UniProtKB/Swiss-Prot annotation:
Modified residues (Phosphoserine): 293, 648, 1136, 1151
Stored InterPro entries: FAM193, FAM193_C
Basic and acidic residues bias spans: 882-909, 921-935
Protein name: Protein FAM193A
One Pfam family named in its UniProt record: FAM193_C
The keyword Cytoplasm is assigned to this record: no
Family: Belongs to the FAM193 family.
Length: 1231
């Protein structure tokens, strides 16, 4: 569109030059084209918008934009606003106006109409441009919001671990039963969590747009001290000690949000917002420009919530004065001490004060010597309230916090990025009013800080990237609920001095929750180790050294000092050294402030940090400690992470004492605001002489003086705690009663000061205590106050490192110790790694120097082969050998069986050949005799008699045979049954009626074969007869029978062939009867089977010869029966099963011997010979279908196989059943 219009415009311009007369027509044409294009675009947009309902209704509607408006804007922006077009439009319009002046009515109307259209379109486009500007603003705002949300999401993702830790802490605290303060804290927090939406009404912060998610709610609870219910003014300082112990922890916990922010800039971890914690910012400081608008809110908030959290509102003016003085002297540290002294609870009691303390602690951690805050407060300490008004009197904690911030940047990603690069000028900012010091004017608020207003607060505390965000760590909650904070409110919350005091308690709690009443086990030695290993790597902890050594550290200290004591300390960092000395003096004034005193710790730590700020800044990046003492950022992260930061700071100072200042060991009771012995009443009057040394003067002025007097922080520490004051009796448990910031550990090195000399034995004891991190007093957020309950440690570290099992000893909640040990372990590993690398390199060098031949030999050598592979190969070879051997044995077995079968077949063939030859001869003779007999018809009668005689003779022979067999076998019964059956075929061969299924008790050959069936069920396993025995016994018997049949059938030559066939069949069928007999013999008298078989064979041979002779003699007599025999032999029909059964029964019954005896014999003898006889009765290993064999023989083989199969099955079944039965009995018996 634009191109077309510009092309038309250029063409019109060219045409105008030669002839101006063409101006109006050309202008008319171009403008009309322009308007037509615009109208077409609007129409197209309207048409398309019908299909874009979702886009317009759900998205564009947010910005009050329509598709048509969007297109009009595009036309106006791209086409109508085109410079070339705009430059020519006036001329074109003038041409059109000229056209209206023509006298041609038609032309005038045309031009006038076009002119009106153009003017309307121009006005519409102008409105579109204006409307679009508004829409663009909305769109930009939406884009910014989305970008902010994404950035926040990214930050929240980074803070996820911190959130989980915090939630775990919250759960532990919820389940933790401590003093009423603890319960109040739990109830308050539960209420806050349950009613997150109402959190904007938080009395501790003005911010009303907090995120309602669980993480942010918890963060807000921790940050604003909501966990601690507002303390009423009527609560007195004397109540503070108990409350302080837990309150400081909670406050410190609240501080942790900033610490957590170190890990991730999540809102939950963001530092306390000034609005949230106006107390933290002195009124004057609160107004500090560095805090931006929040600064303005801070003063009002502090004033507004003075009742609830009166930092300076102490019932006793002396307490206030002392606290203010302490704060002034400590430049916040003094206040912290005073507050703690007045009531460790006071500092922790008022959320604001504790927060202020936290900030103060942060400032100290930033590296500002606690003394600096003290000095600053001392300046403003003349009146606690003056401190509020005075920039110099910003809560020492807050200025200290600012200073701390300088070294200990907020751990959020934004601050962390800037922390390392914090310029010295930012440090010098300490010269500015304390409130502004932390918020280095040079450091503008990072644009991303507003993402976590509930963490960073409206006032971007992050402006001072060094301002360490209080770490909400599990240890932050170890102290009882904010009851301490509640108690604290009675303290003059209004006075910024008190705020610093509160800060001191809470900050110390943050830094030393374990050390201050919660972690008696936390030792300066541990802190030193942490400090040295992580941050310093330098065991010389001379604070003076640190301050002068590190420019940045000096800057930090200087600003802090100047901030705390603008009068005493000039803004420039050069003042830092004096400030340090002043701080030391103040410490002396404080008289042995507990090394755990957060401010003191910070003073020293700040000194160290100042000296090592740069190095620490680097380490702090790694260590997420935003602890004031750890502000150095070396291992600050550790301290931030754990409420033990204060202990760690204290340890740092203790470490300083140990390393460089053995002579000075702060020994202030944890309950004291500065770590001095907590007094039941924070009021100076309440302080005992012993405690007085710790808080020589609760009044701020004394502290400034003392601070100035103190030559050095070490010296101060020496005299710091000449007489450690025991925690107030009100504190039942050091961890509970004493404010977290107060070191309640009797072994606390801070308390170990003997005439200013550090006691190495005590140090050793502390070391051991540290080693044994399992301490009920350790500051921990574990749900269980009693570590001896046997429950597994549920701290985040054990959860992370998998130490979930129940500990052998009480589980330690001393997170600072844990971190220290972990860091030490890490450093050791790092130190060992270079050695390992060197060793590895040496090894590699040795290998590299080896010759290629050696390497190849080594690679190819058999020794190089892994044992597993050789074993596997050996197993494979062994398996292969087994398989080969098995195959070989199987082949040999097959060969033997094959040979055996061949031999048997040969023997059978030979026997059959002999029998056939004999039969042929007999047949020939009989044939001749028959021919002769035919001629002699007259002999028929004689023939009839002869057959009867023959039958009688055969019967006699059978009887003789039976008698013989019976004599051979001891069991006549068995022999009767078997021999009768075997003999019956012979006798029955003469009587065709037997074969005709006559009901004779003697079964025929076929019947006999079937007759074994009844025997099978009795003992199928014994039905199998040895093949050889069958061959020996059956074949002779069959031969005899065949001979009988052949004699009868020898009528004609034609019958010879049939007789030969039938002889084979009977020879095979009769084998069955012997088989059955053998079957019976086997069960009844198996041992005698072999001799019987031999005897039977002999008998059969004899009978055969006798029969042959008889048949030869009686051929003529048997001729008449040939036909009948022929029929019987040719078609022998097996008797019906009933007949077989009857036959079998009759045979057995006919035997004279009783059955019982036979059975007994069968059992006895069968057991002995069954194994040897089984091999004999096995069937032949041949293919019955493929081998050419007689039907009878095939049937016998089939029967053998049937018996074998059934026997096997029966055996298997029987054995299994019996075994199972016995096992079942055993199991039942067992049950």
């Amino acid at each position: 569109m634009k191109v077309r219009l510009l092309r038309q415009l250029s063409a019109a311009a060219k045409a105008k030059a030669p002839s101006g007369l063409q101006g109006p027509p050309q202008a008319h044409h171009f403008v009309s084209l322009l308007l037509e294009e615009y109208a077409a675009l609007c129409q197209a947009a309207r048409s398309i918008s019908t299909f874009l309902g979702t886009l317009e209704n759900e998205h564009l509607k947010k910005f009050q934009v329509t598709w048509e408006l969007h297109n009009k804007h595009l036309f106006e922006n791209l086409v109508f606003s085109e410079p070339l077009l705009q430059s020519n439009l006036p001329a074109l319009v003038s041409q059109i106006r000229l056209g209206t002046t023509t006298h041609d009515t038609c032309t005038e109307d045309m031009y006038s109409t076009l002119l009106q259209r153009y003017q309307r379109s121009e006005e519409e486009l102008r409105k579109v441009a204006e409307e679009w500007l508004e829409c663009q603003k909305r769109i930009d705002a939406y884009v910014d919001e989305q970008m902010t949300m994404k950035t926040k999401q990214r930050m929240l993702t980074e803070d996820w671990e911190i959130f989980k830790q915090r939630r775990l802490i919250e759960e532990q605290l919820t389940n933790k039963k401590v003093v009423t303060g603890e319960n109040n804290f739990t109830d308050t927090r539960r209420h806050m969590l349950s009613s997150r939406l109402s959190m904007p009404d938080c009395p501790n912060c003005n911010y009303r747009r907090r995120c309602a998610c669980d993480d942010c709610s918890l963060s807000h609870i921790l940050t604003c001290g909501i966990m601690d219910t507002p303390v009423t003014d009527d609560i007195h300082i004397h109540q503070l000690p108990l409350q302080v112990d837990s309150a400081p922890d909670y406050l410190s916990e609240m501080r942790p949000p900033s610490v957590s922010s170190a890990s991730s800039g999540s809102g939950s971890s963001s530092p306390i917002t000034i609005q949230q914690h106006p107390r933290l910012i002195l009124t004057d400081n609160g107004s500090a420009p560095t805090f931006c608008s929040d600064d303005e809110d801070v003063a009002p908030l502090s004033a507004k919530f003075a009742d609830i959290y009166p930092l300076t509102n102490y019932d006793d003016t002396n307490v206030v004065a002392n606290m203010n003085g302490i704060h002034s002297e400590l430049n916040g540290g003094g206040e912290n001490m005073a507050l703690k002294d007045e009531s460790p609870q006071v500092s922790s009691t008022s959320r604001s004060s504790s927060e202020a303390d936290d900030e103060d602690a942060d400032g100290e951690s930033s590296g500002e010597p606690p003394g600096a805050p003290k000095q600053e407060e001392a300046i403003g300490n003349g009146n606690p309230k003056t401190e509020e008004s005075n920039v110099n009197t910003p809560p020492p904690s807050y200025p200290a916090q600012q200073a701390e911030q300088t070294p200990n940047t907020c751990e959020c990603h934004v601050c962390k990025q800037e922390a390392s690069g914090l310029p010295a000028s930012a440090m010098t900012a300490g010269a500015l009013p304390p409130g502004h010091q932390f918020l280095s004017p040079e450091k503008p608020t990072h644009p991303a800080l507003h993402l976590y207003p509930h963490i960073h607060g409206h006032v971007p505390l992050h402006t001072v990237p060094h301002l360490p965000r209080p770490l909400i760590h599990p240890t932050l909650y170890p102290a009882p609920p904010f009851t301490h904070s509640k108690a604290l409110p009675p303290a003059p919350v209004q006075s910024h001095t008190n705020k610093p005091q509160a800060f001191n308690a809470s900050l110390q709690d943050h830094i030393y929750p374990s050390c201050f009443g919660n972690t008696p086990d936390w030792n300066s030695s541990k802190f030193i180790s942490l400090w040295e290993s992580e941050m310093m790597n330098d065991k010389n902890w001379n604070p003076g050294t640190f301050l002068p050594d590190t420019i940045s550290g000096n800057d930090i200290l200087g600003p802090v000092l100047s901030e705390t004591r603008p009068e005493a300390l000039p803004p420039p960092p050069s003042n830092e050294a004096p400030a340090v000395s002043d701080i030391k003096e103040k410490k002396n004034a404080a008289k042995k402030k507990c090394l755990y005193n957060f401010q003191d710790a910070f003073m020293e730590a700040n000194e160290v940090a100042m000296a090592n700020t740069v190095a620490m800044a680097t380490s702090s990046a790694t260590s997420s400690v935003s602890c004031t003492a750890t502000t150095v950022q070396s291992s600050s992260s550790q301290f931030k992470v754990s409420s033990r930061r204060p202990p760690s700071i204290g340890d740092v100072f203790h470490g300083l004492n140990k390393e460089d200042h053995r002579h000075s060991a702060p020994a202030a009771p944890r309950n004291s605001p500065t770590g001095l012995a907590p007094l039941p009443a924070l009021s100076p009057s309440a302080l005992s002489p012993a405690s007085t040394p710790h808080l020589p003067n609760l009044a701020a002025p004394s502290f400034p003086k003392t601070a100035t007097t103190a030559p050095g922080f070490v010296d101060t520490r020496k005299s710091f705690c000449p007489t450690p004051v025991a925690p107030p009796p009100s504190t039942t448990d050091g961890s509970i009663s004493a404010p977290p910031s107060v070191c309640s550990d009797p072994d606390c090195e801070g308390h170990r000061c003997e005439n200013g000399v550090y006691d190495p034995q005590q140090d050793d004891g502390d070391e051991s205590a540290d080693e044994d991190s399992c301490s009920e007093h350790s500051s921990s957020t574990s749900t269980s106050t009693n570590q001896k309950e046997g429950k597994y440690c549920d701290c985040c570290y054990c959860e992370f490192f998998g130490h979930g099992g129940p500990p052998a000893a009480p589980t330690s909640r001393n997170y600072a110790e844990m971190r220290e040990k972990l860091r030490l372990r890490l450093t050791k590993r790092k130190e060992e790694q270079p050695k390992k690398m060197e060793q590895i390199s040496e090894r590699e060098g040795v290998v590299d120097h080896r010759r290629v031949e050696d390497l190849l030999q080594f690679i190819n050598s058999s020794e190089a082969k892994p044992v597993s592979s050789s074993r596997a190969a050996k197993r494979a070879r062994h398996k292969q050998r087994k398989l080969e051997e098995k195959a070989r044995l199987e082949a040999e077995a097959r060969a033997r069986e094959h040979l055996h079968h061949q031999e048997e077949q040969k023997q059978r063939e030979e026997e059959e050949d002999e029998e056939e030859e004999d039969e042929e001869q007999h047949f020939k003779e009989e044939f001749q005799r028959l021919q002769e007999l035919q001629k002699l018809r007259a002999a028929k009668k004689k023939k009839k008699d002869r057959p009867s005689k023959d039958c009688s003779k055969l019967d006699m022979l059978a009887r003789n045979f039976q008698a013989a067999t019976e004599s051979i076998s001891n069991s006549e019964n068995i022999h009767n049954g078997s021999l009768e059956q075997t003999e019956e075929p012979e006798t029955s061969s003469h009587s065709p009626s037997r074969h005709m299924n006559h009901s004779e008790p003697r079964p025929g050959p076929g019947a006999n074969g079937d007759a074994t069936d009844p025997v099978d069920p009795r003992d199928p396993s014994k039905l199998l007869l040895p093949k050889e025995v069958n061959g020996k016994q059956h074949e002779p018997l069959a031969f005899l029978l065949d001979m009988m049949h052949h004699h009868k059938e020898g009528n004609s030559k034609q019958k010879l062939k049939q007789t030969s066939k039938t002889s084979n069949e009977p020879a095979r069928k009769p084998t069955e009867p012997p088989k059955t007999t053998e079957v019976q013999l086997k069960p009844r008298a198996q041992p005698e089977l072999k001799p019987k078989v031999v005897d039977l064979a002999l008998l059969t041979e004899q009978k055969r010869e006798e029969r042959k002779t008889n048949s030869n003699n009686n051929n003529k007599k048997q001729l008449s029966h040939i036909k009948e025999e022929k029929l019987s032999t040719v078609t022998p029909e097996p008797p019906s099963p009933s007949q077989l059964l009857q036959n079998g029964r009759l045979i057995l019954a006919s035997s004279p011997q009783p059955k019982g005896k036979n059975k007994k014999n069968k059992k006895k003898k069968g057991d002995r010979t069954s194994s040897s006889l089984d091999d004999v009765f096995l069937p032949k290993d041949i293919d019955l279908d493929s081998v050419d064999m007689d039907e009878t023989e095939r049937e016998v083989e089939y029967f053998k196989r049937f018996c074998l199969d059934s026997a096997r099955q029966n055996r298997q079944r029987l054995s299994i059943n019996w075994s199972n039965f016995s096992l079942k009995k055993a199991t039942f018996a067992a049950h």
